[in-house]
Every structure is written in C-alpha cells, then in structure tokens.
C-alpha cells in the first residue's frame, strides 16, 4: 500500500486533482493506523485496507489476523474516512472481517470469486458472497 506519510505531497496533489473532477478518492494502504491518519491529511475520502496479510494469517489465528485491520479502520473512521478492503478476500475469510469491522463500506473481490464460480457456478457464487457481505444488515 501507499506510504501516506512519505508521499503526502504527491497524494495531496492527486486527491485535489481528482476531487476537482468530482472523483471520490480512496488510498490503498497497509494496516497501519498512521497510514490512515496520513490518508486523511492528504484529503482522501476513503482508505482501502490491503488485506493480503489478513487472508494469509486468518487460518492460523483470525483474532490476531484481524487486529491491525481493526485498529487501522478505527483510525480511519476517527479521521472521518470511509473504509474499503481488498486483496485475497474469499468465502472463508470475508464474513469474519465484516463482522469484526462492520463499518467497512466496500470490499474488492476478484480472483476468489472466479475460482469459486468454477466449482459452484457464477449464480451460486454471487449468492454466497452476498450472504457474507450482508452479515451486518
């Protein structure tokens, strides 16, 4: 993810440019609260949490795997930012992430959805993802 502190000047300029065109800005970051605070200083509307480490560590200890994401999402929320998440999310790990961080606005799911569709079919796969994304509704 972006280092929002090291690249603050560039990201601030890009946020201003996109906002001037009416485009919402989300900055992709690693799960570090200071990166969320940095994204807020840059003028972003949202962050997107890079969830590869969560997905990798989820089978080992889901509470430990989600902890840095919860802290970072809280920092984002405290800063007035929306929260997105994405990378390696799937039918196994998505629901727990959304139950733990219920204020996640959007998730990005790509490869896993297509892989699941090979086994379950596309309609069933989309249905299963919708069930998991509506856990807090």
Q: What feature does the model see in each segment?
A:
Residues 46-58, 103-122:
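Glycine-rich phosphate-binding active-site loops on the catalytic face of alpha/beta enzymes
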Residues 23-76:
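Histidine/lysine/aspartate-rich catalytic loop segments that bind and position anionic ligands
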Residues 32-42, 85, 89-104:
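Catalytic cores of alpha/beta
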Residues 61-62, 116-137:
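C-terminal helical cap(s) of enzyme catalytic domains, especially alpha/beta-barrels
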Residues 30-32, 50-54, 81-82, 86-92, ...:
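Active-site beta-loop-alpha junctions enriched in small/polar residues
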Residues 1-4, 40, 57-61, 134-136:
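Short acidic/polar alpha-helix capping motifs at helix-coil junctions
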Residues 4-26, 62-85, 101, 129-133:
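Alpha-helix-loop-beta-strand connector modules within alpha/beta enzyme cores
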Residues 7, 11, 32, 65, ...:
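Aromatic/hydrophobic pocket-lining residues that form the small-molecule binding cavity
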């Amino acid at each position: 993810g972006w280092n929002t502190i090291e690249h603050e000047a560039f990201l601030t300029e890009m946020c201003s440019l996109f906002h001037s065109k009416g485009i919402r800005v989300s900055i992709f970051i690693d799960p570090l609260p200071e990166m969320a605070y940095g994204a807020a200083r840059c003028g972003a509307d949202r962050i997107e949490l890079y969830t590869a480490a969560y997905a990798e560590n989820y089978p080992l200890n889901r509470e430990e795997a989600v902890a840095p994401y919860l802290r970072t999402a809280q920092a984002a929320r405290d800063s007035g930012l929306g929260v997105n998440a994405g990378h390696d999310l799937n039918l196994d790990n998505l629901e727990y992430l959304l139950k733990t961080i219920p204020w996640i606005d959007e998730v990005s799911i790509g490869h896993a959805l297509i892989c699941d569709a090979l086994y379950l079919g596309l309609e069933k796969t989309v249905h299963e993802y919708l069930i998991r994304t509506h856990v807090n509704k």
